[in-house]
């Protein structure tokens, strides 16, 4: 499943009060009551959980995404008694059908629109495997699902931004490992495969796509990439392989999820401190983070266009 780079040379690039939880009704539209609404994917633990809880504490209505309905409901319950509303939504984002399921749920849950989409869900695996769509699993979750979800929710993001004269915001969680990635030639990642290589390449592709999307949407919808740095979460453990070992050995040097969550929340809620298309690095004790250039490859306009075009072809349009 090539992605159309065959004519290009892209080498290596350096007590408890019950919270206000709204259950999804799959038959009737569910209107959210809050004036400010966000979807946070991967919100059952780690950075996503911290972001969702922080936004809800600010009075936002938060759509809390998990891979299963049970996990999403449990995460919303753990967020506690918050001023905002909590709406559990669920989908497995490895497949296009899973992405469509989440898009449909969000359209029913928030028909009046979203202010913010936080694409936090991510994955890594200890062995090569393909989804039912023929895509390597890491690439499917970390890039193609993000692109498909963002595209499927564009119509919700657009009206809110225009009505408030302040663009809606899409926040992509990236990784500094993108700087060590090989550009993807085939969504299936055939041939030699490593866990770290697949993860880095998926993040490079998504970052390039992020830049391309920011250019196309310009001031209509603001798009940001946030690099959380090395964070102590259950991600490494669940990934297995080298990432699990790195998580065990590096845990004392890693930050808590709350640090990058502060940066994400600041990016989502404060007057724009960064132009759309910014790569923002989470910095200790500085909520708004700071701009830091990403890899040369990710900033190459030709590469961005090719990733965008290849992604659109996969998504169907």
Over which residues does each language-model region extend?
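Rossmann-fold cofactor-recognition segment
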Residues: 81-97
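A glycine-rich helix->loop->beta "capping" turn
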Residues: 83-84, 105-119, 125-130
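C-terminal helical subdomain
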Residues: 248-291, 301-305, 309, 313
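Canonical Rossmann dinucleotide-binding motif of NAD(H)/NADP(H)-dependent dehydrogenases/reductases
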Residues: 27-63
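Active-site Tyr-X3-Lys motif and surrounding loop/helix of classical short-chain dehydrogenase/reductase
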Residues: 101, 105-108, 133-140
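Conserved glycine-rich Rossmann-like NAD(P)H-binding loop of the short-chain dehydrogenase/reductase
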Residues: 58-74
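Catalytic loop of short-chain dehydrogenase/reductase
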Residues: 29, 122, 126-130, 136, ...
